[in-house]
Amino acid sequence: MLNPLSRWLLPLLIGNLSILTCVAQTSTAADSEALQIYQDHCAGCHGAQRTGAMGPALLPESLARLRKAEALNVMLHGRVLTQMPAFARQIPEEKLQRLIELIYSPPAEPPRWEEKDITQSRVSYPVPDNDKPLFSADPQNLFIVVELGDHSATLLDGDKFEAITRFKTRFALHGGPKFSPDGRYVYFASRDGWISKYDIYNMTYLAEIRVGINTRNLAISADGQYLIAANYLPGNLVLLSSKDLSLIKIIPASSGDTTSRVSAVYTAPPRHSFVAALKDIAEVWEITPSDTD
């Protein structure tokens, strides 16, 4: 037999349970709808797993510096000088808000980017048959100015501070350009894992490769033969040949059963090595390219 307090509490608990069930069902339906919108309108450019394709990755790590309000504005009105369309007339704003919540949330399964993905992503462009600069400026006194807003870079004459050329880059370059020892080539890393090699003399790209889903920075060896990228996702270091950006080795960032993101990697010229800082393990690593085999 129920006491008076139980008679009062039981209906209240049942009512609250019903409300929670309805909320959960509504949330699930909203999530499913957002997933469907993503598959219908976004997956073609940003990848079925949100890891990026023609467009950038849409994952929390990749969107860390983009506020949700800015992301919504891009969805509504598109992005100038890109293939990002405006959806204001196709999709109600409240549904785009759900899509925003989706892309700023971790996926159910962590995305993978493995050796096969890296090697298949590599693109080579025609190599110009010219070893002299196509400009009159001093090739040893140049600047590369990275423009974050519209994902472009400018080659600047260091004597006159005048632009020599301006060219498009991958989405959200990060970590600063890295120059070859002779100053002819510059290498870029984007937040969504693209490494690009640019021939300054001929003002053209030579090769690109995607080494990860979220990349922190890039370093070039003192002799100019190697590049190494530090990745948050997946947590590893990726060693490349600077000649053609071909993959040499993937170095997982792990110690025992613990894995880590890689915060940064830098060149140690006197030691002919690289030094990497791990974020989730209290360790600093030294990597000697000649010993990676």
Indicate where each model-derived feature is located.
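Electrostatic cytochrome c docking/interface patches
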Residues: L20-I37
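Repeated scaffold domains used in trafficking and secretory/extracellular systems
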Residues: Y125-P126, N130-K132, L173-K178, N214-I220, ...
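Residue-level detector of Asp-centered blade-edge/turn motifs that repeat once per structural unit
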Residues: D138-P139, P181-D182, A222-D223, P269-P270
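Short loop/turn segments that connect beta-strands within beta-propeller blades
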Residues: G158-K160, D199-M203, S242-L245, P289-T292
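A short beta-strand motif characteristic of beta-propeller blades
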Residues: E162-K168, T204-I209, S246-S255
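Solenoidal tandem-repeat scaffolds enriched in leucines and small polar residues
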Residues: K243-D293
